[in-house]
């Protein structure tokens, strides 16, 4: 079998869009229609400590159809792009082997791009280098660590903002643990794109609709136990630079629990921060193709609100996906 023919028989569906656009609900509708396995492509939904604040699928949804890579990491770890790619490829291949259709669902563009465009294969720096990077960020701050990095690896440092603690720490641990910087590894080692037939549905609701939905959802999260979720995180004494500690709502609710903000102030700040993030997500997805033009559908509304409109959107998305899968199997 040729590579092109093999790819036609290996469909991967992609459901992407900004936070709170209704991706999970659409993924469930599609999974019912295509006997699908939903594979998480959200960098915060990988953390088991953050079911509420990351709006992970409900236990009922997880029982109805297979969900993979949700809640699989403790908050003490980092779900890097390379880690996710390796796990996602394994889950996609397992779905194919079981006769199911894999459905990537999420809003983390760099995760999705690791499959569509490939990824630099950087060696594991090791636990000592990771611990050193976290210690330096916590003790000195990201700007000071950025200065250290610039002295030994100026090329990698030049590509990073000094305040980006996560990426600065990652660059330091790579240099410290491998003896080469990020820029070096990006030039020398690459994992190829996944050989498959991609069909993508991107949700792109109006920003005012999204802002209103974010506010409603965050209020529901607070009522549903988000404060207890953050309280449990704080009890672990985790470094603030860890990704889980920077998830939407965590810093703001943590400030409230410390007495630095009222609950209304924390809620307002969290909603604003999430809204700013969704703008960046929408911009990113508008400039990065997840599938070919004929295999891509953009839906300009949120999957929520009016029930009849939502059902029409579900039907349109499922019809498009089934048609493109069928076309892909007939033609190269």
UniProtKB/Swiss-Prot annotation:
Q: Hey, which family's this protein in?
A: Belongs to the IPP transferase family.
Where does the record place the site Interaction with substrate tRNA?
Answer: 108, 130
What gene name is given for the protein in this entry? Answer: miaA
Q: Where does ATP bind?
A: 17-24
Query: What Pfam families does the database record attribute to this sequence?
Result: IPPT
Report the EC code(s) recorded for this entry.
2.5.1.75
Cofactor names from the entry are: Mg(2+)
InterPro entries from the entry?
A: Dimethylallyltransferase, IPT, P-loop_NTPase
Q: Where is this region: Interaction with substrate tRNA?
A: 42-45, 166-170
Q: Name one GO biological process term.
A: tRNA modification
Tell me what this protein is called.
tRNA dimethylallyltransferase
Q: Which organism is the protein's source?
A: Gluconacetobacter diazotrophicus (strain ATCC 49037 / DSM 5601 / CCUG 37298 / CIP 103539 / LMG 7603 / PAl5)
Task performed by this protein: Catalyzes the transfer of a dimethylallyl group onto the adenine at position 37 in tRNAs that read codons beginning with uridine, leading to the formation of N6-(dimethylallyl)adenosine (i(6)A).
Description of how the protein assembles with itself and partners: Monomer.
């Amino acid at each position: 079998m040729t590579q092109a023919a093999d790819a036609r028989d290996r469909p991967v569906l992609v459901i992407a869009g900004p936070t709170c656009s209704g991706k999970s609900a659409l993924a469930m509708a599609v999974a019912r229609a295509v006997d699908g396995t939903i594979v998480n492509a959200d960098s915060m939904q990988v953390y088991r400590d953050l079911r509420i604040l990351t709006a992970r699928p409900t236990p009922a949804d997880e029982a109805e159809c297979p969900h993979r890579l949700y809640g699989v990491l403790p908050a003490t770890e980092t779900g890097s792009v390379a880690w996710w790619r390796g796990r996602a490829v394994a889950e996609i291949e397992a779905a194919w082997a079981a006769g199911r259709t894999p459905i990537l669902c999420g809003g983390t563009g760099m995760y999705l791009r690791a499959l569509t465009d490939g990824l630099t294969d950087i060696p594991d720096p090791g636990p000592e280098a990771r611990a050193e990077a976290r210690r330096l960020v916590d003790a000195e701050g990201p700007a000071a660590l950025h200065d250290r990095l610039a002295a030994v690896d100026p090329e990698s440092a030049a590509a990073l903002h000094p305040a980006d603690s996560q990426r600065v720490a990652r660059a330091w641990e790579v240099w410290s643990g491998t003896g080469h910087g990020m820029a070096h590894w990006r030039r020398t080692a690459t994992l190829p794109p996944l050989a498959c037939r991609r069909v993508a549905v991107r949700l792109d609701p109006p920003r005012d609709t999204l802002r209103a939905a974010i506010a409603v959802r965050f209020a529901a999260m607070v009522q549903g136990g988000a404060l207890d979720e953050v309280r449990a995180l704080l009890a672990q004494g985790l470094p603030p630079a860890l990704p889980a500690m920077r998830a939407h709502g965590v810093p703001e609710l943590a400030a409230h629990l410390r007495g630095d903000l009222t609950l209304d102030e924390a809620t307002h700040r969290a909603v604003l921060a999430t809204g700013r993030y969704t703008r960046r997500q929408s911009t990113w997805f508008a400039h990065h193709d997840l599938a070919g033009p004929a295999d891509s559908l953009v839906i300009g509304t949120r999957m929520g609100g009016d029930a009849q409109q939502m059902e029409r959107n579900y039907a349109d998305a499922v019809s498009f996906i089934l048609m493109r899968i069928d076309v892909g199997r007939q033609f190269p």
